[in-house]
Amino acid sequence: MKNLKKKLTLTGLMTAGLLFLSGCVQTHVVDGVRVPTEAATHGITYNFLVRPMSAFVDLFANNLHMGYGWGIIFVTLIIRFLILPLGLNQAYKSTYMQEKMAYLAPVFAPLQERLKKAQTPEEKMAAQQALMAAQKDNGINMLSSIGCLPMLIQWPFFIALYNAAAYTTGISSSTFYGIPLGHPSVVLVIISGVLYFIQTWISTLSMTPEQKKSGMAMLIMSPAMIVVFSFMSPAGVALYWAVGGFVIVIQQIIITFIMKPRMRRRIDEEFTKNPPKINNEGLKDVTPTSVQENFKEITSERNEKERKSGGRNAGKQNRK
């Protein structure tokens, strides 16, 4: 039931985000082509976001004679790489807290077990408070990892890019290597879906088994939603999704293979110097293993693995 709720919540958030992108500019169909309404062209969103981005696309398409397909590609690449540091900053905060939670999961396990086995409302409340206090004492604050500011800064660019790719004058009548940009393209839909699948697959490579259980939903839903919306949109929008997917794959590679290993080393150092703080006072003891023993066991296993890994690496270096 909990997994189902997570999947439904995730699907709802993704759908809301995609609908938000497309719904910021009101449109209607004129001569078989969907264009912004007269009222929308005088609105704040169109004039301050979409119109400048459309002019940027026109710069590459007409002034530099590259065509609208390459115009969408270059503008999307430029904007996405400009805001890439914001995306990495947001990912760093959320990923750091997730890695910290994963590291401390064996330590919090007895407290969570006590919470499950608590029988009276008083015991449940006391166990919940103890768990929250333990998380606070060990620097766990999931709200601080959300990173609303970077997300808010990025959204106007996403809105502008999406609507510029969809409604810039001239795109609907243009082609890109034989693909009509004003009509859905199966080729671009497949490319978009594959790129977003690769991104989510890379994100699972460094996950713990527990994280993978929830991550598998994202592995399927993220590319599926992109495929559905790309298929329902003109090829110009699907091209925007595909280029954006390419940048997201690069971002995910940085997160998985550069940021996460550094985070784990940092977390190891933090808790080696300052072991987890757990206050067991006032709790009904329903688990035989203490928190500190559990922590020592998990850290000793991790240190043993690191020593074996270090020994193998050292042997390889000596043979060289």
Swiss-Prot record:
Residues 1-23 form the signal peptide. The chain crosses the membrane at residues 68-88, 142-162, 178-198, 217-237, 239-259. It is found in: Cell membrane. Residues 270-320 are annotated as: Disordered. GO terms for cellular component: plasma membrane. Residues 294-309 have a biased composition (Basic and acidic residues). One of its GO terms (molecular function) is membrane insertase activity. A lipid is attached at C24 (S-diacylglycerol cysteine). A lipid is attached at C24 (N-palmitoyl cysteine). The keyword ATP-binding does not apply. GO terms for biological process: protein insertion into membrane; protein transport. The keyword Cell membrane applies. Keywords: Cell membrane, Chaperone, Lipoprotein, Membrane, Palmitate, Protein transport, Signal, Transmembrane, Transmembrane helix, Transport. It is a multi-pass membrane protein. PANTHER family: CYTOCHROME C OXIDASE ASSEMBLY PROTEIN COX18, MITOCHONDRIAL, OXA1. NCBIfam families: PRK02463.1, yidC_oxa1_cterm. Required for the insertion and/or proper folding and/or complex formation of integral membrane proteins into the membrane. Involved in integration of membrane proteins that insert both dependently and independently of the Sec translocase complex, as well as at least some lipoproteins. Belongs to the OXA1/ALB3/YidC family. Type 2 subfamily. This is Membrane protein insertase YidC 2. It comes from Lactococcus lactis subsp. lactis (strain IL1403). The lineage of its organism: Bacteria, Bacillati, Bacillota, Bacilli, Lactobacillales. The gene is yidC2.
